[in-house]
A protein has these predicted regions:
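N-terminal leader/targeting segments and the immediate start of mature chains
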Residues: 1-53, 198-228
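Short, hydrophobic/aromatic-rich segments at coil-to-beta transitions
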Residues: 17-27, 49-55, 134-142, 164-170
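A generic structural motif
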Residues: 27-33, 57, 94-96, 144-146, ...
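Short, cysteine-centered beta-strand-loop-beta hairpins and adjacent loop/turn segments enriched
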Residues: 31-37, 61-67, 146-152
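Short acidic, Pro/Gly- and aromatic-enriched capping/linker segments at domain boundaries
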Residues: 114-132, 187-197
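Gly/Pro-enriched, hydrophobic low-complexity segments
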Residues: 134-202
Length: 228
């Protein structure tokens, strides 16, 4: 998920050079070749420059079994924030319920791929109609993306006239799957810089194996401190 946002910015910037900074409620869905929903990921999304914030409620993901969702909620691991800082070449996974986070580097391979996408990808766009999406009058555009040594990809964008042509709905169509991204309650404004920083009092964990023991210990300490 963390790597989707920078690619989204590169793709949109090639189509809309003046892509605005904004915040919105986002929905990402993946369907298989038969049209069956395989993954749903609702999130609060914010874009500031080349940096991104995605707030995810894990209990709102239907693909996660109910008993697992309950366990995550009990341990306060149900709220996850992804902060992608391209300028620092870092991704932060922040668990606000336990005041802890993980930090990962953005690989040079990934950053090189972003650079290639921004320079070598050829996009052809064709207006195929108009449509109103969530109350916004949109131009519907078919996009064909070609890149050396890679198969051609196609997608459809709905660009909102009253939101500086921001695509508020995107469908990327592949051979055996379809990705759909939608933005609602869009606010065209520069998000606060503090949203892209990890709170100073949060504990940095060494690796992902530390999350569950740390959350369990926090829960045990909270239970011990509770009035009897």
């Amino acid at each position: 998920m963390a790597t989707i946002a920078p690619r989204f910015k590169v793709f949109i910037s090639k189509l809309c050079p003046d892509v605005p900074e904004f915040s919105a409620k986002a929905s990402e869905q993946i369907f298989d070749g038969q049209g069956n929903l395989r993954m749903s990921l609702p999130a609060n999304f914010a874009l500031r420059g080349d940096n991104f914030r995605q707030e995810i409620d894990m209990t709102a993901m239907p693909q996660i079994p109910p008993e697992q969702r309950k366990a995550m909620e009990f341990l306060k691991l149900d709220k996850l924030t992804l902060i992608t800082r391209v300028d620092r070449k870092r991704v932060y996974l922040v668990f606000s319920g336990i005041h802890a986070y993980l930090e990962f580097p953005l690989s040079e391979t990934f950053l090189n791929e972003l650079n290639v996408q921004s320079t070598a990808v050829n996009l052809q766009k064709t207006k195929i109609g108009t449509e109103t999406i969530n109350g916004h009058a949109c131009t519907k555009i078919k996009v064909t993306a070609s890149e050396p040594n890679k198969p051609t990809e196609e997608g459809i964008l709905w660009c909102a006239a009253d939101l500086q042509q921001l695509p508020i709905k995107i469908e990327s169509i592949g051979k055996d799957r379809m990705l759909r991204i939608e933005f609602q309650d869009v606010q065209i404004a520069k998000p606060n810089a503090s949203l892209f920083e990890v709170p100073a009092d949060y504990v940095r964990l060494s690796n992902s194996k530390d999350i569950l023991p740390y959350a369990t210990a926090k829960q045990r300490d909270a239970k011990s401190a509770a009035p009897k």
